[in-house]
Every structure is written in structure tokens, then in C-alpha cells.
């Protein structure tokens, strides 16, 4: 066998590595306390539809959200009036600031603004406000777009107006395409998904047949390895293209996916597909299609590397009908992320996982593969529950928060029942049934926690016991917080720091706003902690209230390169700003560690 026989294989390998490398390069490093400037976290654009109508779009970065009730429109001059805004439904989120459920938007927001008989050009001013999941709330942002009532064609997209409180800090301009997602973790997850998909009952029996078609009857082990890998890479190219297409489609479908009917239709599709995984019906291509595709693949030379790659691409459609439901769930996830690069990398990893057993068979390691049996049926059922979870995840943005928590509870408990968690194990049960029992108990407890949380007033499935914690904190007799001295301008801060330096005391400057959810959490959960109060006993406590978002407030935020509250700046006893700062919400333990790093144990008195 000559080296030239491996050239097509090498080209396929290079293509696969190039796809993965491009996806990796798309991920910048992001520190835990780096936040996007508001104009990048909430990218504003607008297009004039006709003389009176403007379509407004916000591209919301991953890890950020906007408030529905904070959206408002105005005109300059103010004589122009507008029809009432028709905003799409948002995701319901419990807001600690207002102590009620509020609607929020993620990923994308599209709505139209209609002026009432505007005769002359005017500027449309859109006011919006949003927050980051990590705890920072931005001041209200005003974006401006020029409207020409006589315009007959769409105007170009508007440039965003720099929001109040933005700064030139380099760290805040680090943009994360995945919103902090880990591409390596996503690749490993989809690689494992591909392995699991291969071991479903309708795919595993086909591995020896496919191996015989690809490798041929008289291939050496080296030749078999080359042809098998080529087959897998051919299949991977198809799946990668599907993943990229799903990501690109997701970018264009984000606005449509905010519609409750569209979300409901996708969720219903996931439920229908899950029924196939539970064995209620068989899902596969029509017999005529499968026959024609098989004939086309059989006409190719069985032992050629290039032919194997083409057959791998064809087999992406005919090899595994059982893969279709789980693949649909994966594509639904990719489409919602709206990231084409991640979509391609994820599906490439999944196809590689699906191809590993085929390569093992091709090189003669078929004896390492498990036999088909009952556990493979269980694997299909696991995917069925995953698809039900995908359905719930898709429709969750339009569900009331309490209903979403109840639905997750029902799904988790149903999975526990399927694992026979509440059935007695025989005395001679093996390790796998016992492991299933353990997993079932964990699922049942997780479902019970959701029910307890919703009964206690929790409204977040990821933090189901938040209501219990709020009730517990409210019941504490000693919930006194620290007392701050209010400052309103840069000059007042400088004067207060100089006064503290004269007495040899360090300073802590806290940024606060009434509309800041995480500020309320810091006030209620962190600054009321006895250990925090003790550690701050000898520290001069300043607080800048930037609720009004006036000129002095913006100057203060800019002075310390902040986008918004909550944030805490420290000064040592000599008046020097400490390199350590707190951005976003921190619980008492974490805040104490930050305080001691900033001021040292000598100045930040440790609690006893």
C-alpha cells in the first residue's frame, strides 16, 4: 500500500481540523468579571419600513437580558406621537427589586414603532434597560434613529447611541460569541451524544454490515483503518454542514422563535419525536428513498478511500433512522444558540462519536462492541426523556415561571419512575440496577425540590429554593445592614477619601441603584451578614446612588470604568485605589474573601 492512498484521507482530516480550529479561534478568553459595554450587550438597529413605521431590533448577547417594561419610545421633536407598542411576550422572571414576576427578553427582540401622521423628519428615541446574568444592571440606554416620513425605501441600519455610563475599559470590551460557553465542553458533550446514538438498537446491528461494505473483503488492517476513517469523516462533513446551517438559520429565526405559537409547535415536534424513542412508532425514511440511496452507495468502489468518504456522506441519511429524533433535538439547541461555528463544531463532534464504533469494527475490534440487549432499549428511553426536556426548554420562555417549575418537577419524577426508583430491588441485583436506583432517587429529589420551591414562592427552576431563602432571611430578627455615607459626585468621593486617609482608615465605595436587582441582593443578603458587618467595622463606607443616571452619576461610573451597579471599589488607608474590586453580586463568604484581598487582614478586620 502506497502513501498516495492516504492523501484523500489526509485532506479530509485537514478539513475537519480546520473546522474545529476556526471554532476555537472564535472563542476569546473571558474573565469572570468582564462585562460587555451596553451598546455591545444590547446591539440596537432599526429599519424604516414605510413613511410611518420603523422596525426596531435588539441583538442581545448571551448571558444578558432586557426588561420588557423598561422599553419606551419618544420623538424629537416631541410633537410626534406613536401608536401603543405591540411587544412580543417575554420570558417571565421573578424580580427581587419589584417583588413580582417581570418579562424579560434574551437573544433577540424585534418590534415595530408606528408614528401617527408624522409630516416632517424626526428622531426616534428608544429607551431600554437590561442586566447581565452575573449580576450587573446597566443604566437606561437611549438609542436614536432618524425617520424620514417621505422615504420610499428602507433606510440603512441605525448605529447605536453610546449608552450612559459606558467606559473605555479594555476588559469590558471582550466579546464572547458563546456568552461564556466552553467550546471544549460542548464538543465533549456532543461526542458522548454521538457514542450513545450509535448504540441504539437499530444502529448497532448495522455496524458489521456497513463495515463489510466500506472495507471490502480483502483489506489489510491498515487499509481498513484508512477507509473506515474516511467513511467517518465523510459522514462528519455532512453533519457539520447541517450544524452550520442550523446555526445560521437560528440567527434569522430568533425573532420568530419569540412567538408563543412557534415555540409551541417546536415543542410539540419534540414531544412527537420522543414518542418514537419510547417505541410508540417507528421513525425512518420511506422505503423507496432508502432503497435508492442504498443502490447509489453500492455503485461506488468499496475499498477506495475517496469512495468510502462519499458513502459516509450518503450514509448520514440512511444508516441510522433512530438518530433522527435525537438529532432533531440537537439541532433545536443549536438553532436557539444562533451560532453557526458552534453548530458545526458540535455536529462534527457528534458524528465523530458516532463513527468511533465503526472504526473499531473496521480495524477488527468488533469483539469490543457490546451486544444488543435490553440496555439499548433503555438508551432510547433516555433520549426520549432528553427530548421531552428539550421540548420544555423550548417552550419555557412563554410559560409562567411557576408552571415551568411544575413541568420540570413532573418530568424529573417521571424519569425516576421509569428507572423503577420506587420498586424493590431483588437481593441479587447487579451494579447497574443499583446505579439506576441511585440516579432515580436523585431525579426524584430534584423534582421534589422544584415542587417545594414553587410552593414557597420560588420562580426560577435553576434556583428553586430562592423563595425559601428569602423567607428565611426575612424571618431573621437581626437583619440590620451596614450604614453608608451617600456621595453624589467625583469631588465628594475624593474629599471623603482624603478625610479617611487623614484618620488612617480604608474606604469602601459601593455603587447602588433602585432598579438594580443585584444591588438589592447585596443589601439584603451580603451587607446584613454579621461577619461582613464585623469586617467593615473600621472601614469608611461610601455609597453612590446612580438611580437617576444624571451627569454626576455617569461621571462617577466612568471614573472607575464601570458600566453600572452593583460594584464596589476599595481604597487603602493611604488613599490608593486597591487593584481588587467587586463587580456584580457576591455572597457573604465570597465578598469577605474579596475584601481581605483588597484591604488585607490588618485593615479589613476578620470576624470572630
UniProtKB/Swiss-Prot annotation:
It is a multi-pass membrane protein. SUPFAM superfamilies: Thiol:disulfide interchange protein DsbD, N-terminal domain (DsbD-alpha), Thioredoxin-like. GO terms for biological process: cell redox homeostasis; cytochrome complex assembly. Keywords: Cell inner membrane, Cell membrane, Cytochrome c-type biogenesis, Disulfide bond, Electron transport, Membrane, NAD, Oxidoreductase, Redox-active center, Signal, Transmembrane, Transmembrane helix, Transport. It comes from the Bacteria. It catalyses: [protein]-dithiol + NAD(+) = [protein]-disulfide + NADH + H(+); [protein]-dithiol + NADP(+) = [protein]-disulfide + NADPH + H(+). It is found in: Cell inner membrane. The chain crosses the membrane at residues 193-215, 227-249, 259-281, 302-324, 344-366, 373-395, 400-422, 435-457. One of its GO terms (cellular component) is plasma membrane. Residues 1-31 form the signal peptide. Pfam families: DsbD_N, DsbD_TM, Thioredoxin_7. Residues 464-600 form the Thioredoxin domain. GO terms for molecular function: electron transfer activity; protein-disulfide reductase [NAD(P)H] activity. Its EC number is 1.8.1.8. PROSITE patterns: THIOREDOXIN_1, THIOREDOXIN_2. Disulfide bonds join 131-137, 202-322, 516-519. Belongs to the thioredoxin family. DsbD subfamily. Required to facilitate the formation of correct disulfide bonds in some periplasmic proteins and for the assembly of the periplasmic c-type cytochromes. Acts by transferring electrons from cytoplasmic thioredoxin to the periplasm. This transfer involves a cascade of disulfide bond formation and reduction steps. This is Thiol:disulfide interchange protein DsbD. It comes from Ralstonia nicotianae (strain ATCC BAA-1114 / GMI1000) (Ralstonia solanacearum). The lineage of its organism: Bacteria, Pseudomonadati, Pseudomonadota, Betaproteobacteria, Burkholderiales. The gene is dsbD.
Amino acid at each position: 500500500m502506497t502513501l498516495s492512498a492516504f492523501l484523500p484521507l489526509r485532506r479530509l482530516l485537514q478539513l475537519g481540523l480546520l473546522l474545529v480550529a476556526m471554532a476555537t479561534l472564535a472563542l476569546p478568553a473571558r474573565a469572570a468579571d468582564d462585562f460587555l459595554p451596553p451598546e455591545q450587550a444590547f446591539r440596537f438597529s432599526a429599519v424604516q419600513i414605510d413613511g410611518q413605521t420603523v422596525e426596531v431590533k435588539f441583538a442581545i448577547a448571551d448571558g444578558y437580558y432586557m426588561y420588557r417594561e423598561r422599553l419606551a419610545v419618544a420623538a424629537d421633536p416631541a410633537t410626534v406621537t406613536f401608536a401603543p407598542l405591540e411587544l412580543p411576550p417575554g420570558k417571565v422572571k421573578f424580580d427581587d427589586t419589584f417583588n413580582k414576576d417581570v418579562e424579560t427578553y434574551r437573544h433577540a427582540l424585534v418590534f415595530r414603532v408606528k408614528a401617527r401622521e408624522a409630516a416632517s423628519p424626526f428622531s426616534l428615541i428608544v429607551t431600554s434597560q437590561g442586566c447581565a446574568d452575573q449580576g450587573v444592571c446597566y443604566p437606561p440606554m437611549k438609542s436614536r434613529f432618524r425617520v424620514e416620513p417621505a422615504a420610499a425605501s428602507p433606510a440603512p441600519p441605525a448605529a447605536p447611541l453610546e449608552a450612559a455610563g459606558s467606559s473605555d475599559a479594555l476588559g469590558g470590551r471582550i466579546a464572547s460569541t458563546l456568552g461564556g460557553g466552553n467550546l471544549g465542553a460542548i464538543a465533549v458533550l456532543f461526542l458522548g451524544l454521538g457514542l450513545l446514538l450509535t448504540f441504539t438498537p437499530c444502529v448497532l446491528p448495522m455496524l458489521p454490515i456497513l463495515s463489510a461494505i466500506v472495507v471490502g473483503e480483502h483489506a489489510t488492517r491498515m487499509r481498513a483503518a484508512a477507509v473506515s476513517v474516511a467513511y467517518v469523516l465523510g459522514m462528519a462533513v455532512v453533519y457539520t454542514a447541517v450544524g452550520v446551517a442550523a446555526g445560521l438559520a437560528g440567527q434569522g429565526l430568533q425573532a420568530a422563535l419569540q412567538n408563543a405559537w412557534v415555540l409551541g409547535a417546536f415543542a410539540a415536534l419534540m414531544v412527537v419525536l420522543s414518542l418514537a424513542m419510547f417505541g410508540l412508532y417507528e421513525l425512518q425514511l420511506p422505503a423507496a428513498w432508502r432503497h435508492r440511496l442504498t443502490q447509489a452507495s453500492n455503485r461506488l468502489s468499496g475499498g477506495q478511500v475517496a469512495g468510502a468518504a462519499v458513502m459516509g456522506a450518503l450514509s448520514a441519511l440512511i444508516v441510522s433512522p433512530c438518530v433522527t429524533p435525537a438529532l432533531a433535538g440537537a439541532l433545536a439547541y443549536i438553532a436557539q444558540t444562533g451560532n453557526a461555528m458552534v453548530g458545526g463544531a458540535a455536529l462534527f463532534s457528534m458524528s465523530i462519536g458516532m463513527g468511533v464504533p465503526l472504526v473499531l469494527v473496521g480495524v477488527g475490534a468488533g469483539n469490543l462492541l457490546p451486544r444488543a440487549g435490553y440496555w439499548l432499549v433503555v438508551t432510547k428511553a433516555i433520549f426520549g426523556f432528553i427530548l421531552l426536556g428539550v421540548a420544555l426548554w423550548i417552550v419555557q420562555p412563554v410559560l409562567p415561571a411557576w408552571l415551568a417549575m411544575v413541568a420540570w418537577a413532573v418530568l424529573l419524577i417521571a424519569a425516576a419512575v421509569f428507572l423503577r426508583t420506587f420498586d424493590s430491588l431483588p437481593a441479587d441485583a447487579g451494579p447497574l440496577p443499583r446505579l439506576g436506583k441511585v440516579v432515580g432517587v436523585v431525579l426524584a429529589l430534584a423534582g421534589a425540590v422544584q415542587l417545594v420551591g414553587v410552593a414557597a414562592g420560588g420562580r426560577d427552576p435553576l434556583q428553586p429554593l430562592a423563595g425559601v431563602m428569602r423567607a428565611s432571611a426575612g424571618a431573621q430578627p437581626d437583619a440590620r445592614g451596614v450604614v453608608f455615607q451617600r456621595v453624589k459626585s467625583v469631588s465628594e468621593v475624593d474629599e471623603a477619601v482624603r478625610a479617611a486617609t487623614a484618620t488612617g482608615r480604608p474606604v469602601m465605595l459601593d455603587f447602588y441603584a433602585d432598579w438594580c436587582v443585584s444591588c438589592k441582593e447585596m443589601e439584603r443578603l451580603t451587607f446584613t451578614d454579621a461577619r461582613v458587618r464585623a469586617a467593615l467595622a473600621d472601614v469608611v463606607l461610601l455609597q453612590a446612588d446612580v438611580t437617576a443616571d444624571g451627569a454626576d452619576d455617569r461621571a462617577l461610573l466612568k471614573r472607575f470604568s464601570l458600566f453600572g451597579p452593583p460594584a464596589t471599589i476599595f481604597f487603602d488607608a493611604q488613599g490608593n485605589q486597591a487593584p481588587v474590586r467587586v463587580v456584580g453580586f457576591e455572597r457573604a463568604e465570597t465578598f469577605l474573601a474579596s475584601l481581605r484581598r483588597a484591604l488585607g487582614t490588618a485593615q479589613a478586620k476578620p470576624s470572630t
